[in-house]
Amino acid sequence: MPKIPSKETPRGVAIAEPIIVEHSVDLLMVGGGMGNCGAAFEAVRWADKYAPEAKILLVDKASLERSGAVAQGLSAINTYLGDNNADDYVRMVRTDLMGLVREDLIYDLGRHVDDSVHLFEEWGLPVWIKDEHGHNLDGAQAKAAGKSLRNGDKPVRSGRWQIMINGESYKVIVAEAAKNALGQDRIIERIFIVKLLLDKNTPNRIAGAVGFNLRANEVHIFKANAMVVACGGAVNVYRPRSVGEGMGRAWYPVWNAGSTYTMCAQVGAEMTMMENRFVPARFKDGYGPVGAWFLLFKAKATNCKGEDYCATNRAMLKPYEERGYAKGHVIPTCLRNHMMLREMREGRGPIYMDTKTALQTSFATMSPAQQKHLEAEAWEDFLDMCVGQANLWAATNCAPEERGSEIMPTEPYLLGSHSGCCGIWASGPDEAWVPEDYKVRAANGKVYNRMTTVEGLWTCADGVGASGHKFSSGSHAEGRIVGKQMVRWYLDHKDFKPEFVETAEELKTLIYRPYYNYEKGKGASTCPVVNPEYISPKNFMMRLIKCTDEYGGGVGTYYNTSKALLDTGFWLMEMLEEDSLKLAARDLHELLRCWENYHRLWTVRLHMQHIAFREESRYPGFYYRADFLGLDDSKWKCFVNSKYDPAKKETKIFKKPYYQIIPTDA
C-alpha cells in the first residue's frame, strides 16, 4: 500500500535482520552514569591487585562522557560532609524522607563520600574555596591560589551539605577517570541492555544480560559471573508539564526509563519503597535548579501577594511535628510542596522565586564589579546544568535582578539518589551494628555489601532503595563500594559457569519483536504511525502517561489518587500490556523507544501497586491517598517491599520492619 507523507519520519539508523554477538565476561557493568563510573574505577583498582585475569566490561546505551543524570553538568555537589559527621547525615536524610530509610546504607555512604569528592577535585573538577579572609573563590581562582579540599581548605557551602563547583564538565571529568581505569577495550558504548538473564542450573543466580546495538543491527548477549545494573531512575512515566513543542524537557534525564527497576525486578530482585516518588519544585517550564537560589543567594519563595508561604502556612506542619516529623532545621521536601500546593489550590499562585530581592539585598554591600560577578554566577548556575532554563529566561526577557521567576512542582519522578528513595532492596555492610534483616546472605553464607536478593547482582545510585540524598558524589561513592564487592564475589566464585535457559535465537526474536511487528503489519495502512496491526512507541507512551496522570496521582489531579482511581488505572494497564506486544519499530531509534516503554510500563505499574498497598499518605506534597489522608505510624512505620516470581509471573507486596540505628538527637 502506498504511504502518505508523514511528519513523523524515521530518525534513527535503518533497521534490518540482526546478527548475534556473544560475550563472556566476569564482571559486567550496565549503565554509564556516576554510579558505574565509580564501580569501574574501584573494580579495576582491586582486580589489578587480586584478580588481574578477571574480564571486566562496562556497557552503556549512550556515550560515557555525557551519560546519566550529570550529563549536562552541575553547579553544586549536594553531598560533602567535611566537618559534619555521618550520624548527622543520617538524621538529615531520615527527616527529609519522613522517617523511613535504611540507616545502615546511608551511614555507610556518609563515611566514604568525601573521598570521591576529593578524587573529583584531583581529576580536575573546579571547586569553590574560601580564602583566608572568608571570601569566595570560584574554581579557577581557587586553583590559581593553590587551594584544595584535600589540603584542608574550606569549601564554599551553599548549605550544610552542599558545596559549589564550576561543573559544566563534571561528568566528562569523572568519565575520563573511569575510561582511564578500564581502557577503551573494556567499554562498549551505544549498546542498550534491556533484559537480565538467570542461570539455568542455579536458582536465583544472575547469569547475564541481553541488549542491542543502537548503531548497527546486532543483538548482544553477555554471560557474566557478577553484574551491577545502574541505569538511573524513571522519567516520562507521568505526563510532564512540558507538552507540545516543549515535550522532552524534564527535570531528570528523559533517557532514564525505569530500566534499573524493571530489569532487576523481572529476575526476582526484592524491591523496596517503590511507592516513593520525587516531585521537585523547580523554575516553571525550564525545570531550572533552585538550590543555589535558596541556599547561596538566600532567595525566598513567595505567593502572588509577596508572602513567604512557608511562614504563613506554618500551622500545616503541626500535625506532623506532633508525630515527631518536620522537626529541627530540616522541613521535609514533600511538606514544603504540601504548603506550596495549598497556595496554588486556594488561588494565591503563581509562586515566585524572589530573585529581585535576593540580588538587590546582596548588591547593597557590593561594588559594581562584584555585582556583575554575582549576576554572572546566577546565570552560570543554569548554564552549568540546565541550559534550557537560561534560554527560557532570555526568551522571556527575564532579568532576575528586576523581577522574580515562577516556580512550580513538576510531574513525579521515580529515583533513589535525590530526595526520593524508591528502588531495590540491597544488602548493608556485614558489621555488628547492622540489623540481620538488613543483610543479604549469599548461598556461601557471606554478606556482599549492596548486593540485591538475586545472587551475583548488584545495584547502586538510583537503584538502591530506601536511601536517598546520595546525589552525584554519593552515587559515585556507592558505585565504588559495589566495584570492590564484585571483585570479592568473583574471587569467591571463580568456578561458576553461567548457562541460560533461553537460546540465542529466542533472545534475538524477543529483542527485535518490534521490528518484526512493523514488517508484518506495515502494509495495513497508508500512515506508518497509525496502523491497526501495531502501535508506535510515541503513541504508546502518550497512552501510558495519560493513564498514570489521571489515575496514579499526577499533576492533573494535584497528585491525588485513591483505591478506585488506582484500580481503574490497573484495568487500563492490562490493555496497555497487551498492546505492548504490538509495539513496532521502523528504525533502531524506535527500537530503543519501544524497549524504554516496556521498562516504563513495568516500573510505573509497580509504583502504583505500592501506593495501593500503603494505606496512608506518607509523602504529602508528593502524592496523596485521598481515601487515606494523614500518616498512620501504628500500621505503616515500615518498608513496603515487593518481589516478582519469574516462574509464577506473580508479584507479592509485603511489609518489612524498619530499625532506627542512629538516635534521634545528637
From Swiss-Prot:
UniProt: FAD binding residues: 32-35, 60-61, 67-69, 78, 193, 259, 417, 461-462, 472
GO MF annotation, one: FAD binding
Positions marked as site (Important for interaction with AprB and for the recognition of substrate at the substrate channel entrance): R160
Uppermost EC category: oxidoreductase
Range of residues in the leader sequence: none
Main location: cytoplasm
Enzyme Commission (EC) number: 1.8.99.2
Annotated catalysed reactions: sulfite + A + AMP + 2 H(+) = adenosine 5'-phosphosulfate + AH2
UniProt subcellular location: Cytoplasm
UniProt-listed GO biological process terms: dissimilatory sulfate reduction; protein heterotetramerization
Pfam families: FAD_binding_2 (PF00890)
Domain remark text: Consists of three sections from the N- to the C-terminus: FAD-binding domain, capping domain and helical domain. The FAD-binding domain and the capping domain slightly overlap and form a channel that may transport the substrate.
Protein function: Catalytic subunit of the adenylylsulfate reductase which catalyzes reversibly the reduction of adenosine 5'-phosphosulfate (APS) to sulfite and AMP during dissimilatory sulfate reduction.
Protein name: Adenylylsulfate reductase subunit alpha
The encoding gene: aprA
